[in-house]
Amino acid sequence: CYFSRYFTILNNKIFVKNIVTIRGTGESTIKEEPSSFDADETCGIIISITEKEILILAQQNTVKVGGQYRVYFQLGDAVPCEVKGYDSKTGLAVVSVLISQTTNGIQKSIAAVQMGTSKAISRGKYVIAVGNPLGNMSSVQVGIINSTSFVSSYVDGVITLLSTNLISQSKGSGFFLDEDGRLIGIITHDGDEAKETNFIKALGISDVTTNLERLANGKNIPYFGIRVSTVTEKIARENELPEGVYVESVILDSPAMATAIQKGDIIQEVGKNSVKTAKQLQQVLSNYEIGANLSISLKRFSPTGYKTVLCYVTLTSLMELK
C-alpha cells in the first residue's frame, strides 16, 4: 500500500546514506561525531557524487563562503570541505568534498539522493522529514502535507511552500523525501510566527533546481534586486491594474535600482519573454548569465493612467543580502 513504501524507507534507513552533518571548525582536526546542533553546524544532503567530488546541499545561513568546515559522515568520519557556491536569496549552499580526501569506507557508505519534483506533491500525501527536523542529528519524522498553496517571497521571485502537520522546532532543519526516497523539499523557517506552535514546512525543490545546478557547477546566481507578487486576472479586474508581475520593493544599490525600476511598476516582458507571474519572472531570470543586458517592458502609473516604459538592466553576481 501507499504507506508501506514509507515504512520500507524508514525500516531500511535508506536515507542514512544521503545525510551528513557540516560543522564549522578552526584548525582542529579532532574527529568526533556530533549528536546535537549549535550555531556553527547544520545538516546536509548528498546531491551528487562524481569521480572528483561529493556535492552536498546545505543551508547558507550557517555555511559561509570562506569559512572552515568539516563534513561528518554517518560512520563518524570527518573530512574537510569547501563552500562551492551559495544563494543568499534562499539561504542555500552547495558544499564540496574531494573524493581524494575520503576513505573507501566512506565511499561505500554514502549515496546521492535522487531528485524528485515538488510540483506533483498534493495535500494529503505522506512526507518524510530527515536530517535535523527535531533539532538533533539523524532525527526523522513522517507527516502529511497540509497545503501547497502558499508561497514565500524572495528576491527576484517566489517559492512554493510545502506545509505539513508536523510540529516545528526552532533549531530544526533538514529535507523532505517522498514515498520513493526522492528529495522534494528543503526545510525552512521562513514565515514562522512568534507563537508557541509552528508547523514544519519546506521550499519546493522544483523552484530551486535551476539555481542548485548553477551552484553545483561553481556558478553564481544572477541578481536583479526586486521583490514581487503576481497581478492575476482577478486582481487586475477588481483593482483596474494591468496584469503582470508587481514590484513590491526595490533592493538598495541593486541592478533594478540602477535602472530606475520603481515600487508599483508592473513588469510584463523580460527580453523577448512574456512574464505574467512571479514564478515566470524567476524562471526567465535564471536562464540568463551574469552580465546579461536585458530589456524590461513594464507598466508604470501616471496621472493619465498606466503607460508602457522600457528599461535596460545588467544582471550582476548575487551579493550577500541583508
Question: Each PLM stretch: what is its role?
Answer:
Residues 117-119, 123-157, 192-195, 212-215:
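Flexible, gly/ser-rich surface segments that form the specificity/activation loops bordering the active-site cleft
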Residues 47, 52-55, 184, 256-278:
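Conserved PDZ fold ligand-binding element
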Residues 100-112, 141-199, 243-248:
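Active-site region of chymotrypsin-like
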Residues 1, 7, 179, 183-242, ...:
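C-terminal cap/linker of serine protease catalytic domains
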Residues 19, 23, 54-58, 120-133, ...:
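Active-site-proximal beta-strands of protease catalytic cores
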Residues 48-131, 135-138, 170, 276, ...:
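Conserved active-site neighborhood of the chymotrypsin/trypsin-like protease fold
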Residues 1-70, 91:
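N-terminal activation segment of mature serine protease catalytic domains
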Residues 269-297:
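PDZ domains, with a preference for the canonical peptide-binding region formed by the helix
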